[in-house]
A protein has these predicted regions:
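Hydrophobic membrane-insertion alpha-helices, especially the h-region
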Residues: 18-36
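Soluble "head" domains of membrane/secretory-pathway proteins
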Residues: 2-17, 36-37, 41-42, 47-282
Length: 282
């Protein structure tokens, strides 16, 4: 008896072989989209507070600065010099990068471009010898939840109780405006932190100086690589993409085995938050 599919002279393409091929094609498509267009990103710490919170999920675009080895998702590409269609970020952009040594993903804000001289004195930032504009803002009150403050956070000292007795973070906010007009909020915990004094350091060609918005709780370009910092300005090739928007945010109460808990764990008013900084004069 002839096998099914052979009666009209065609080869049977069914079975495990076709399934495996389909899965491989899908995986390659996902990898291509993640590497060339956009990918999701999870915030695991408080180093970019107040704009980003532990538990936020973001969309990171891959094309604004061109492509390099760091653009390839899952760290599959070998480290090679060079960037295709490379375009430098603007000061104030939030970028995802591969740590130059460990290849772990970090997310920080671009503060200095090639040729800029960066210095901090008593926590006050200057670029090219000119102090960055700082404006003290009202205290920011954020509800505490299982994801906030994050593990090993520097922010636990700011936990207090609101009028209803609920735990909240009361954060000291300073708004900075960089050369070029990018303006955004930072957390300034006060004097006495090791990263309050730094430099001056001139950013080399094809490098960027990156900092977290939680200025006294961020391992960034000011912090030695032995302390999980970036160890100075970062090669432009290490930049993987630009943070664009918050897709959703969770408070840490969801249980994976209970789908009904997933909706209740969503933080209100976080989805859709634009992560591009305001730019004065534009």
């Amino acid at each position: 008896m002839a096998k099914r599919g052979a009666r009209n002279g065609t080869k049977d393409d069914g079975g495990w072989g076709k399934l495996i091929r389909d899965v491989v094609v899908i995986l390659l498509l996902v990898l291509g989209i993640h590497s060339c267009v956009a990918k999701p990103f999870y915030i695991p710490s408080d180093s970019m507070m107040p704009v980003l919170r532990n538990g936020d999920r973001l969309i990171v675009s891959k094309y604004p600065y061109g492509w390099s080895y760091s653009s390839v998702s899952f760290h599959l590409a070998p480290k090679v010099d060079g960037r295709i269609f490379g375009t430098l970020p603007e000061r104030g952009d939030i970028v995802v990068l591969e740590h130059p040594l460990t290849r772990i993903d970090y997310i920080k804000r671009v503060i200095g471009l090639p040729g800029d001289t960066i210095a901090l004195r008593n926590g006050e930032l200057s670029i090219n010898g000119k102090p960055v504009k700082r404006e003290v803002q009202p205290m920011l009150s954020i509800p505490v939840d299982p994801n906030l403050p994050g593990p090993d956070s520097s922010l636990f000292r700011f936990v207090s109780r609101d009028a209803r007795g609920e735990p909240v973070l009361e954060l000291p906010i300073v708004r900075e405006t960089l050369p070029g007009g990018a303006t955004f909020d930072t957390i300034d915990m006060g004097p006495g932190y090791p990263t309050d004094d730094y430099g001056p350091v001139t950013v080399p060609a094809n490098h960027l100086f990156l900092m977290g918005d939680n200025r006294d709780g961020s391992a960034d370009s000011r912090v030695d690589a032995s302390q999980k910092g970036l160890g100075g300005p970062v090669p432009f090739d290490a930049i993987a993409g630009r943070a664009e928007i918050i897709s959703f945010s969770t408070d840490g109460t969801a249980e994976w085995y209970n789908p009904l808990s997933w909706l209740g764990a969503l933080r209100p008013n976080r989805a859709g938050t634009d992560l591009r900084p305001e730019r004065q004069g534009k």
